[in-house]
Amino acid sequence: DLHVKSSKSWEWGIGLASCDFSLNASNTLGVTINAQLINIHNHFQGNWILTTDNTNTTGFREETNNNVRKSYLSYWELNIPVLMEYQYKIGHNKLYMAIGPGMEIRKSEHSRYFIEDDKYTETSDVNLNPIGLNIQGYCGYGDMMIYFRSAITPLLNSNKAPKCFPVSIGLGFSL
């Protein structure tokens, strides 16, 4: 059991670059390639803390001597999706949707927790897989969108850690 607290987990990101290729004369169908930098925080329930022991095996331990206020895994990723996009102009804005595969490069992971106001880093090595593959997409209108991303490869090295496949759903907007 991963003891995930999904309602408290979150991520934020910024689009670094985008490149689009139209596949038809009316510019309604195309391929879009993006580069996004994303910071992710996966929170855990109760007194559970993600840790790596001296045999380099990652798992959960329960803190029984203190009340853990917050426990989470955080990491950065560079996400590079290649998506097939369809768009349709309505008034002055476009209705658009896209779906396709994505690759992410993950690094700088930390398992941290709080007891009262004191923050502790449990480990900086949770056997994070450095490369991940996803199915992802979005749909939107104008400057607002709803996005989703679902891993098809595990977040952690399954030989040394619990098997988990992250899923993200969120809102995006253009500045």
Model-based region annotation:
Residues 24-52:
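Early exported N-terminus immediately downstream of N-terminal targeting peptides
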Residues 69-106:
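Detector for outer-membrane/organellar transmembrane beta-barrel domains
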